[in-house]
């Protein structure tokens, strides 16, 4: 009999960098991890997770476990971001910028078995993930701005995260999956008659928002089931490999405003087009070996950040910065050790090279660093939890980002600070 499992998670993440945070081109799934196990292993084992977060990292793996699950997680991030003037001695700190903002996300996920829809006994499992910043208070937050001071490329607000997909077993040992990352594209039109004093009349405002759907495709191979399904001593038992492709995604906004000042200006247009929370097209590959008590895994992401060079040419907020990006490879390694039937320890590490080649970006002043991400977590399974009829799994994890020093030149065409984000 297959039993659904309810999971409750708590994640903690700490970041150390060299700038103040404001806008963000990252998302919670790529910066930290969706569920506590993803955070603990620095996403090294995320492609082989039986939790609902697989819908984003590797939807094919949903078919590996037919048990339904309902998951909830609380992700708290504390960023300590500092910058120091060039050639400033350590004992004389001038114009030191310290940003200690904290943030939190609520993440909900579920998966359910739909195998009864098929005539044969073939697994098909549906998964869903939802992430909202500050319990929904910043559900559709958007921030894209010029700045006279440094602003972090990846750290900052995390927009709404939404992903839906399914995994399907083709033959024993081979699964495929598809899912979608859903973002938002907003368009606004504004018109008004304005007076020199600032008063307006005959205002008109139209706002339209539509979802933008980006695909995720993946495949998973269990070599033991493929090569030697009936031999429990086969060398391939416990060996799995996976591959995933995720298309680029972002949140976008287009504003078309027009003002009329009678007897002075007949047409004053204002056109703004910008993107936020950009994630590049990504190819991922992973391998896992599952022993009696130990699970070892490694993965690598190839991220095509160079595509952002052309995207920013049409961004009216950032096009003057002439930002340059490069493609990067992110290696990860992680483990899970099962101490007994109910308690496990997880850990992982990754090295993330910065895709930002530019060390100077006029009026935008993006900064980013190479970093080492380290995670550690614990998992506890409660077979009989109070009034619940199903097992409950509790996960706690901690992640630390160690950012390497890097020099940037901050440039601006403004004479005085005004309206920085």
Roles of regions detected by a PLM:
Residues 2-23:
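Gram-negative bacterial Sec-dependent N-terminal signal peptides
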Residues 20-122, 360, 367-370:
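N-terminal, post-signal peptide beta-strand-biased segments of exported outer-membrane/organellar beta-barrel
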Residues 24-39, 105-421:
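Outer-membrane beta-barrel porins/channels
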């Amino acid at each position: 009999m297959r039993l659904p499992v309810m999971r409750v998670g708590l994640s903690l993440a700490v970041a150390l960098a060299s700038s103040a945070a404001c806008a963000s081109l990252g998302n919670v799934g790529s910066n930290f991890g969706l569920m506590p196990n993803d955070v603990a292993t620095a996403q090294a084992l995320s492609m082989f997770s039986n939790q609902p977060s697989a819908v984003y990292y590797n939807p094919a793996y949903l078919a590996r476990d037919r048990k339904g699950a309902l998951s909830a997680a609380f992700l708290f991030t504390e960023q300590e971001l500092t910058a120091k003037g060039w050639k400033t001695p350590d004992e004389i700190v001038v114009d030191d910028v310290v940003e200690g903002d904290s943030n939190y996300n609520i993440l909900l996920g579920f998966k359910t078995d739909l195998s009864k829809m098929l005539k044969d006994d073939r697994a098909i499992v549906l998964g869903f993930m939802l992430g909202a910043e500050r319990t929904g208070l910043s559900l559709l937050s958007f921030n894209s701005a010029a700045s006279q001071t440094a602003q972090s490329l990846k750290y900052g607000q995390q927009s709404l995260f939404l992903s839906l997909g399914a995994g399907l077993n083709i033959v024993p040992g081979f699964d495929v999956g598809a899912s979608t990352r859903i973002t938002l594209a907003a368009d606004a039109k504004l018109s008004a008659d304005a007076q020199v004093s600032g008063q307006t009349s005959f205002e008109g405002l139209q706002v339209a928002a539509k979802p933008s759907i980006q695909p995720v495709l993946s495949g998973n191979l269990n070599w033991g089931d493929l090569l030697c399904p009936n031999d429990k001593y086969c060398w391939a038992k416990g060996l799995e490999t996976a591959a995933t492709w995720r298309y680029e995604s972002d949140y976008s906004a287009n504003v078309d405003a027009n003002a009329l000042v009678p007897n002075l200006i007949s047409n004053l247009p204002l056109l703004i087009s910008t993107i936020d929370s950009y994630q590049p097209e990504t190819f991922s590959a992973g391998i896992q070996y599952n022993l009696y008590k130990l699970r070892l895994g490694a993965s690598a992401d190839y991220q095509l950040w160079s595509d952002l060079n052309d995207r920013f040419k049409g961004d009216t907020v950032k096009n003057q910065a002439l930002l340059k990006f490069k493609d990067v490879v992110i290696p990860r390694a992680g483990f899970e050790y099962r101490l007994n039937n109910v308690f496990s320890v997880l850990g992982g590490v990754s090295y993330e090279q910065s895709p930002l080649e530019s060390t100077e970006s006029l009026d935008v002043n993006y900064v980013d660093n190479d970093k080492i991400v380290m995670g550690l977590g614990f998992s506890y399974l409660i077979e009989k939890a109070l009034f619940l009829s199903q097992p409950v799994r509790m996960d706690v994890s901690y992640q630390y980002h160690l950012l390497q020093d890097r020099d940037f030149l901050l440039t601006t065409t403004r004479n005085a600070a005004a309206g920085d984000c």
